[in-house]
Amino acid sequence: MSKSLQAIRGMNDILPEQSPLWRYFEGTVAGLLDTYGYSQIRTPIVEFTELFKRSIGEVTDIVEKEMYTFEDRNGDSLTLRPEGTAACVRAVLEHGITGNGQVQKLWYIGQMFRHERPQKGRYRQFHQIGVEVFNLDGPDIDAELIMLTWRLWGLLGIQDAVKLELNSLGTSEARARYRDALVEFLSARLEQLDEDSQRRLKSNPLRILDSKDPNTQAVLVGAPKLEDYLDEDSRVHFEGLKARLDAAGIPFVINTKLVRGLDYYSKTVFEWVTDKLGAQGTVCAGGRYDGLVEQMGGKPTTGVGFAMGIERLILLLETLGKVPASINRQIDVYLCAFGEQAELAGLRLSESLRDRLPGLRLAVNAGGGSFKSQFKKADKSGALFALILGDDELAKQEIGLKPLRGQGEQQNIAWDALAEHLETAIAQA
């Protein structure tokens, strides 16, 4: 196949055999968010480039290296969204839905785009589910977001495989004081830092704390600590969050080097990490961004949120063997009909079954075929039962019901009793 007819590197198709797991995961998250009172918002995948420069920060890796940016026919610079928070903030500002202190608890799902080196668990087009809350500034809402994700891990059966890491970045003023102290310390040890950290020292020194270079990490052992520069309000907020997590029985560790890769965070930051996926260990991350709305032209409005990577969490479910067997069955019943009159009766019967059993997953054979070929297709479909309708059954207004996945003989069931019989048989299968 020529290159022009292949998917772009790092942008993957989700094939039919993969879709049930995606639907299961997305449905589980959406259902949980509904129970917590969150409303869905949908934003475009393309925004003006300036939005991300103002929100994420011009000297971040995302803006400098990773964004898909292009000029449209009007000469405007546009960018495929690399993350969801900025677009969500833009939307609530544009439509005025956080005015007068109105609380908004929102969630979204969709594709994000970053030009990174593709590897296991990291792609150029990837999917996120994110949550954003506006106009609530206490540690209680921070705790709710973390408790919500902890409950999700329980529903998915992966609580034992993830760990919560917490930190507080304080206010922008506190970070500025810390930044000055950190720059002074590291400038005196510049030659001991890796090349990337030397570059970041001038542009975004807090990101050096997250360096993976062992020599840089050795230097950081003696560096000033962010917690020593926190303002009192941030300290109280962080203690309040930890107290609530303790009360909820959610284990956590403090990671003083956790700073996140986006400039807009303040006070609480957190990550859920796993050691089951190799280097790509973060599956969910978030924090507070109390100054972002004002920074983007709105009135002072507090914000807090998180985003989770769907690809990584699905990979984690597969790695741990936590994929429910039931989701791989697409069809409950496969109807085989032999002869034109049986086919016509089968169509009427199948639609009657759909009326009476709205959740029934029923496939009707298409394209005709012999008994052997139709039965082979029924078995291959993964259905629990085959319905068999021929001239003999048609004359008696009956239909054959044959188990495909377990023990049991074929039974002939009267048409008017079929719906009730099927419902019971599927429930017991």
UniProtKB/Swiss-Prot annotation:
Tree of life domain: Bacteria
GO biological process: histidyl-tRNA aminoacylation
InterPro entries attached to this UniProt entry: aa-tRNA-synth_II, aa-tRNA-synth_II/BPL/LPL, Anticodon-bd, Anticodon-bd_dom_sf, His-tRNA-ligase, HisRS-like_core, HisRS/HisZ, HisRS_anticodon
Gene Ontology MF: a single term: ATP binding
EC number(s) stated in the UniProt entry for this protein: 6.1.1.21
Gene Ontology cellular-component terms listed: cytoplasm
Keywords: Aminoacyl-tRNA synthetase, ATP-binding, Cytoplasm, Ligase, Nucleotide-binding, Protein biosynthesis
Enzyme class: ligase
Recorded catalytic activity of this chain's protein: tRNA(His) + L-histidine + ATP = L-histidyl-tRNA(His) + AMP + diphosphate + H(+)
Compartment(s) where it occurs, according to its Swiss-Prot or TrEMBL record: Cytoplasm
Pfam assignment, any one: tRNA-synt_His
Record-stated family: Belongs to the class-II aminoacyl-tRNA synthetase family.
Subunit structure as annotated in this protein's UniProt entry: Homodimer.
Protein name: Histidine--tRNA ligase
Species of provenance: Pseudomonas putida (strain W619)
